[in-house]
Amino acid sequence: MTKKRKFLTILVLGMITAIGPFSIDMYLPAFADIAADLHTTVGHVSLSLSSFFIGISLGQFIYGPMLDRFGRKKPLFAGLFIYLAASAMCALAQSADMLIALRFLQALGGCAGMVASRAMVRDIFSVEDNAKVFSMLMLVVGISPIIAPTLGSLVTVELGWHYIFVILAIMALIIVLAIHFGLPESREADPDYSLKPAAIFRNFGLVIKEPQFYTYAFTGAAAAAGLYAYIAGSPAVFLQIFKVSEHQYGLIFALVAGGLIIATQLNRLLLRTYKSEQIIPVALCMQSVAGISLFVGSLTGWIGLAGTIILLLMFLSCQGFTFPNSSALSMAPFAKNAGSASALMGAVQMSLGAVSSGLVSVFSNGTALPMTAVMACCAIISLIILYFGKRMIRYKASDH
């Protein structure tokens, strides 16, 4: 693959990856406006975030087998058109419950891009390069919180929150065109791949039984669940508790995301010297320290706005190390069932994300405690999973 082709491929994969983060981050600054317009509370509106996570979690079980059976592009196109239509309908939502339902449908379509992009990385690039490519794609996850909330707040002020979803629909159309013209099919259709329920469950079973998969998929998902808790809780924490403006909230969100961007690029440099297996535990320890400090600080009241931002910056920067490395290690054992492996990994991540964001919403009490408590628990749980999972990997290796 030439450098130009590699750059173009990663660029288009990055655009596909952007669907999820933009769908989440862009409408966060509009929570208060949406709540006022639909005559409900910010907490009720935040359930549309949980429904989005649930839709992504369930949808990935559909697209994983389809990507292995029909190739990567056809199921991807189908999902993006569902996403486009649902985005347009979200713009017309007349109630919070309608928005929650439509966000679920939007996620069912958009998750095709998340599953396909991971599977295509496994198809196109060598196992050794996967972590580096995932680090580059993680740039999108880092950049989107800088661009999306700022754009979302601007659109909300100038045009109204409905137009956020119009822009998301237009973005989906642009991505469809980019895939059609700029991304070759990475895996041809496999007529022998069965879509019968028994065969699908058997393939998923083969994936989930692999110790390397469940160790790093669940470790990465638990760590990422802390990020989703932050996403769900940060509007209330900054807008209502610290009383910052929507514009200031967008700037804070962008500042914290900047740490994630720097970390992803530092991870690429570290991979020249260290293995992914060596980087992950160090990052998780740092994330746990930041999470516990946030919780204790919010419980005792000894940290203010500046301290909260600094600790959030530390916590979320660790995602730049854990996500690309855990993704690469989870996908490494699979070539034939890359679609199913990608679906399972994404479903685990989004399921835990739905749980963590849901817990923050349900236990919302006007303080930062629900968000910080969930974030701290996620970091600690990820360390526990990694410890016991690595023992299972060593046990399997000793059997052979």
What is the meaning of each model-derived region?
Residues L329-T367, V374-M375:
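A late C-terminal transmembrane helix in Major Facilitator Superfamily
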